[in-house]
Amino acid sequence: MKTQLMKRAAALCLAVVLTLSVNAAALFGGKEKAQPAEGSPTAQALEIRTYRGIPYHAQFLAAGGEGEDLTFTVEKEPKKGTVQIDGASFTYTPEGDSTGSDSFTYTATDSAGRVSQPATVSVTIEKAKSGVTYADTADSTAAVAAQDLAEAGIFTGAKIGDQYYFEPDKPVSRSEFLAMVMETA
């Protein structure tokens, strides 16, 4: 008898809690995610990694929507850097000596004006440990890859005086390629 009474009391308490929570959401406005319109583009989350002081060049990842033309908008700005949009491409530039994690969100809009749900670009900013800073990769899309090669000790380019030069537009010779392959083995 006592067990049955306890079960009924627990069920009654649960019903009261559920009723109050549903009514509170109705009265005070629950946090309901807005759904994109049917046929809206879909923006995908991205993860990027760069080094302190080195811009990262990439393309937004979005598909669908009306027509082929998508435009992109940054909805939430990053805190440790800046984002510049050029068509479907973007450049994230870390500010000053920033390191650590950062993020920003973007949306895609199709030619009919339908907007995607926001997607997050997660950014990791690392400090270069190799001591190599290239004098000729400031605006190059190869800057992060060049720094990756230096950090791994695979290729540091040419050193003239105190400056390192990656020479991103110069073709790699067979002997340089062979040396890089042997270094990774």
For each feature predicted by the language model, list its residue ranges.
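Sec-dependent N-terminal signal peptides of Gram-positive bacterial secreted proteins and lipoproteins
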Residues: 5-27
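Low-complexity, acidic Ser/Thr/Pro-rich repeat tracts that form intrinsically disordered stalk/linker regions
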Residues: 24-49, 127, 138-139
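Extracellular ectodomain surface segments
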Residues: 37-75
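Low-complexity "stalk/linker" and mucin-like segments enriched in Ser/Thr/Pro/Ala/Gly
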Residues: 73-88, 158
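Extracellular/luminal low-complexity segments enriched in Ser/Thr/Pro
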Residues: 89-99, 106, 166-168
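Conserved structural position at the C-terminal beta-strand
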Residues: 108-110
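C-terminal edge beta-strand
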Residues: 113-128
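Extracytoplasmic Gram-positive cell-surface binding/anchoring modules and repeats
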Residues: 127-185
